Amino acid sequence: MEEGPLPGGLPSPEDAMVTELLSPEGPFASENIGLKAPVKYEEDEFHVFKEAYLGPADPKEPVLHAFNPALGADCKGQVKAKLAGGDSDGGELLGEYPGIPELSALEDVALLQAPQPPACNVHFLSSLLPAHRSPAVLPLGAWVLEGASHPGVRMIPVEIKEAGGTTTSNNPEEATLQNLLAQESCCKFPSSQELEDASCCSLKKDSNPMVICQLKGGTQMLCIDNSRTRELKALHLVPQYQDQNNYLQSDVPKPMTALVGRFLPASTKLNLITQQLEGALPSVVNGSAFPSGSTLPGPPKITLAGYCDCFASGDFCNNCNCNNCCNNLHHDIERFKAIKACLGRNPEAFQPKIGKGQLGNVKPQHNKGCNCRRSGCLKNYCECYEAQIMCSSICKCIGCKNYEESPERKTLMSMPNYMQTGGLEGSHYLPPTKFSGLPRFSHDRRPSSCISWEVVEATCACLLAQGEEAEKEHCSKCLAEQMILEEFGRCLSQILHTEFKSKGLKME
C-alpha cells in the first residue's frame, strides 16, 4: 500500500488502541509479518501502522473503523501507513482475508461538523461535494439508522431567512438554496453573490440549517425543519410570475421561499417511507420538476387584435388559417367587447385606410399614411403602393420612392406585367441598371389591353339597340334574350380579333 497523506490526527485514546492492536498479543498479529518497534510521534504526524489494522475483524463482514473526531479545515497533520513486511508478506496477508472495499479519495468526501452525527453513521450532503461530482443520494431519518439508502431522494441543504425582512424572529420562513449544481438543476436560482449575502444573514439568526429533499422526477419536495426531530413537510413547486409575491394559496399560511420555483408547505405532514411504499407520491412526465404547460395558470391571451386583417376590416374570419380564432359568431360577446375596446382607444379604428380623394381629385388618398422603413414604398408592404396610389405628405415613410417623378417608380411601371414582378408581396426591388437589357417602350405605346371604357360603351350601345329592335318586332321574351346574346357574342368576337391583330397573332 502506497503512502498517502491524510488530514487530521488521532487523539490519545486512538494511540493506545493502535498500540494494543499492533502488539504481539493483539488480534492482528501474524506469524509471517514482523512488527516494527513503536514509532515516536511528532506533533503533526501520525505514527506508522500496518495495513492489517484496516483489514476486517470478521472475514464475512468487512468493517471500516470510523473517525470519531470530525475532520476540519484546521487539521493540517498527516498520517503515513505502510506494510512492515515485504511484498510477499503483503500478498499472504491479503490472501487470508477478503479484499478491502475500494475507498474514494478524501477530496470527494466531506464530513459535517455540527451537529455531531451518531458514532455508527456519517452524514454526507451533496452540496459539500466538489463541483465535478454528481450529487450524492442520501438516506433520511430512520433510513440512516437502518443503514439503507433510497435512490430516489436527493439532499439539498438550504439556509433560513425571514420572509418579511425582519431580523428578530426565530421562526424561519424562507429558504435560500446553496451550491446547487447547474447540470442537475431544473429551475433558475439567484446569483452566487445573493446566495452569499443571504447565507451570512441567515447563519446569524438560526444555527440549525433546513434540509430540503427533492424526489427525483417529482414535483414534491420534503423539508426537514429540525435535524433532531426530523419533521417532514410536503412542498410543492409553483411557477414564477410577475405577481409572484402576491401569489399565495388559500390553504397555505406561509411561503417557504420567494425564489423562482416557490416552495409552499402543505398543511399536513407526510411520512416519507409510508408514502413511498404505498406509491402515493405523484410522478411527472419527462422528469420535469414543474407542472406541465397546460396546467400552469398564465395571463389571459389576446385572441382579437388589430393585426388580424379580417377583424381590422370589421369582417368575420372565413376560411382562414388562424388558430383559436374568436372572430366568429360563436364568440360574439368577446368580439363585441374587443370592438368596443378598440373604438374606445381610437374612434377611427375600423374606418377604411384608403378613403375617397378631395373634391375634384380622382385618385384616392391614404387616411393615415404609410410607415415604411426599408422597402422604399415600392412593395406590397406599403399600403399606398398596394392601393396603387402615391405617398402623400401625411406618410411617415423613410427613403420613399413612390412619388410622381421617382425614376425607380417609372422604371418599375415601364416593365411588362410590373404588378407581377415588383408589386407582389415579398418581391425584391431591382435598380434601373438591372433593366438595361430589357426593351424600352415608347411613351405612346398601346395599352396592354384593348378593352377600354370606349369599347365597353360601344358594346353596351349595340346590346341596347338589339333589345329595342326585338321590342319593336314584338318578339317573345326568349327570342329577345337570344338576339341580345348573339349580339354580345358578335361584339366579343370583334374585340378578340382586334386584340390578336394588334399582337401579330392570327385567329383561326
UniProtKB/Swiss-Prot annotation:
Q: Which residues carry this modification: N6-acetyllysine?
A: 40
Instruction: Tell me which PROSITE patterns the record gives.
Output: CRC (PS51634)
Function, as annotated, reads: Essential for normal spermatogenesis and male fertility. Required for the completion of meiosis in male germ cells.
Gene Ontology cellular-component terms for this entry are:
cytoplasm; male germ cell nucleus; nucleus
Q: List where in the cell it is found.
A: Cytoplasm; Nucleus
- What is the native source organism of this protein? Homo sapiens
Q: Which GO terms describe its biological process?
A: cell differentiation; intracellular monoatomic cation homeostasis; male meiotic nuclear division; regulation of DNA-templated transcription; response to metal ion; spermatogenesis
Alphabetically list the UniProt keywords. Answer: Acetylation, Cytoplasm, Developmental protein, Differentiation, Meiosis, Nucleus, Spermatogenesis
Q: Which family does it belong to?
A: Belongs to the lin-54 family.
The CRC domain sits at: 292-405
Superkingdom as given in the UniProt entry: Eukaryota
GO MF term (any one)? metal ion binding
The answer on whether this UniProt entry bears the keyword Nucleus reads yes
Tissue expression per record = Expressed specifically in testis.
Name the record gives this protein: Tesmin
Look up keyword Cytoplasm and say if it applies: yes
